């Protein structure tokens, strides 16, 4: 049964879904990494595809920008289509001088200036954390591929152009590795819905140093992150 935002039929989605923000990235992942992939939804041009990776059925779908957008799609995927695992694959801006552009961050947890998780807990704080098994798989996959990654907390913001510039220094002092716009929302949806989630983030820009990747570097590093995400997906037992 379709939802207001997803037109797929029952069974069209695999139980594991990779979610980039950009729907064109979803098409790219489908074309480059999946075998026998087909488009399963295109409502509002938020494209979704299902195929196989090394024989394991996997889906990929865009989630748009920000906590509200990813929350809508993740909720409908989990509750209507039976998705059990969602892996966000996106970009982030580094907050620490110890973190370099091109690095991939395994987001073990996410603070946020969004109010969505407090709404879930009637005004109380919620520990928005990744599924431990998924995070461990990502670290192990990176080690096998000899790909340096970092594991640690990130900060999810509702504002891309944030007026409180002093916040960055505070976050860095507290050990937050990077800022992005969706992970805390995804982890909240997963916890509320009994699903599991992980955020894998490529450092595309450095907020402190001003360094950023070239378009070619972004593509290459993005591919390395997708390979890690697919390794994590492939290791998930089929239901």
UniProtKB/Swiss-Prot annotation:
NCBIfam families hit by this protein: deoD (TIGR00107), PRK05819.1 (NF004489), PRK13374.1 (NF009914)
Site (Important for catalytic activity): 218
Gene transcribed to yield this protein: deoD
Record-stated family: Belongs to the PNP/UDP phosphorylase family.
GO biological process, one term: purine nucleoside catabolic process
Protein name per UniProt: Purine nucleoside phosphorylase DeoD-type
Pfam families noted in UniProt: PNP_UDP_1 (PF01048)
Sequence positions that bind phosphate: 21, 25, 44, 88-91
GO cellular component term of the entry, any: cytosol
Function (record text): Catalyzes the reversible phosphorolytic breakdown of the N-glycosidic bond in the beta-(deoxy)ribonucleoside molecules, with the formation of the corresponding free purine bases and pentose-1-phosphate.
Keyword Transferase belongs to the record: yes
The reaction(s) this protein catalyses: a purine D-ribonucleoside + phosphate = a purine nucleobase + alpha-D-ribose 1-phosphate; a purine 2'-deoxy-D-ribonucleoside + phosphate = a purine nucleobase + 2-deoxy-alpha-D-ribose 1-phosphate
Superkingdom to which the source organism belongs: Bacteria
Keywords in alphabetical order: Glycosyltransferase, Transferase
GO molecular function, one term: purine-nucleoside phosphorylase activity
InterPro entries named in the record: DeoD-type, Nucleoside_phosphorylase_CS, Nucleoside_phosphorylase_d, Nucleoside_phosphorylase_sf
